């Protein structure tokens, strides 16, 4: 027994020396890590909030240990700019969660590939073909159809006095907007069994990627899959890929049988063009996994953001009235706003920026990884370090924003700050070479859906949830409201 106790003591001493040796290597400051678990007990249920509190003590570049995973938390625009732009190449890698290994997604997905020629080809396709201004303009009519379906559903609820579950409605609408833009089809319908199945798959992928997994912090556990996360991820990823492959195979066969048929204005047409032209060194798997990334990422983040937008507007009726009056002055009695009219709606744009400041859908963005040893602000960030950017903390920093906890769209009316990656005080979509490729479509979806709901109805909180804490958050791949927003549409 004494020998075992001695060996255990020596082990813990050695481990502690290892964990604390970073301070002698001039790593960024941070809280003292416990043996084995590091700082995991300090995370709480909302890690972005815990990191924000810790950064007040340790600064905007902070070290923590998540089990054996050494991590640096970035909590200021200055540090974010230095890492994402000045040292963008050094920090271009990704930390890959075990769930992302499902169906070899980590080896194929643009979101997780290293910066190689394949990655560059995929980014080029997104920028120049899928999300170009011309492509998005061509598919606007499809999005109008899906917004009309949302309008019809809300009208039925209005007539019966029934509350709209905004998360559910936003999910279905976003999914259909994404499906229309990508496949010229409708993925789901309001109040249908097919909706429940598709929702289960999409939310399953988003949840399983976002759920804490001990194997990500203690790699020795990866072969055992103790939480069953890899097994569940294989199931969800496989089901979604099968659906996407079905759409692709159907389009390829349709073109083969009818080569002179009119082209459709969707992403799938672009994908088939790429396959037939063989211009890029890409496989069909690269393209189907790209569509999976866009589908899941776009559906989850847009749904979450739309729920927060409507939440803030409903609990701030004076701001809602300003958005409504502005839309009315531009479009009159027309039910759905044209995307070309968005530049004439500065207060709506400001309101959406304000929501993305307070409630960035991914508060820590997607993790980066240091590809080399790199000095930042006088500190060493070793190769292999995970980098997290606390966009939530930056958006609520009182040294940057006046009254940061208040919902004040007016703050954006007299400044040029935008969320497109150049203004580091507002980076809900990231920045640099790995900025979210679907941002141009997300921008249209958020503005158009919000405008449709606000313009056509007045809204009031359902009595059952009227007294809920409307700022409570539920952490995941995207941070949603802890209590789903249920509001009743009224005739204006």
UniProtKB/Swiss-Prot annotation:
Any one GO molecular-function label of the UniProt entry: heme binding
Biotechnology: Ferruginol is a widespread diterpenoid metabolite that serves as a bioactive natural product in its own right, and has been shown to exhibit a range of activities similar to that of the tanshinones such as anti-tumor and antibacterial properties. It therefore contributes to the medicinal effect of Isodon rubescens.
Enzyme class name: oxidoreductase
UniProt main location, coarse: endoplasmic reticulum
UniProt xrefs under InterPro entries: Cyt_P450, Cyt_P450_CS, Cyt_P450_E_grp-I, Cyt_P450_sf
Record-level GO BP terms: miltiradiene biosynthetic process; terpenoid biosynthetic process
Pfam families associated with the record: p450
Domain of life: Eukaryota
Function: Cytochrome P450 enzyme (CYP) which catalyzes a unique two-electron oxidation cascade on abieta-8,11,13-triene to produce ferruginol, an intermediate in tanshinone biosynthesis.
Family named by the database record: Belongs to the cytochrome P450 family.
Protein name (record): Ferruginol synthase
Organism: Isodon rubescens (Rabdosia rubescens)
Taxonomic path: Eukaryota, Viridiplantae, Streptophyta, Embryophyta, Tracheophyta
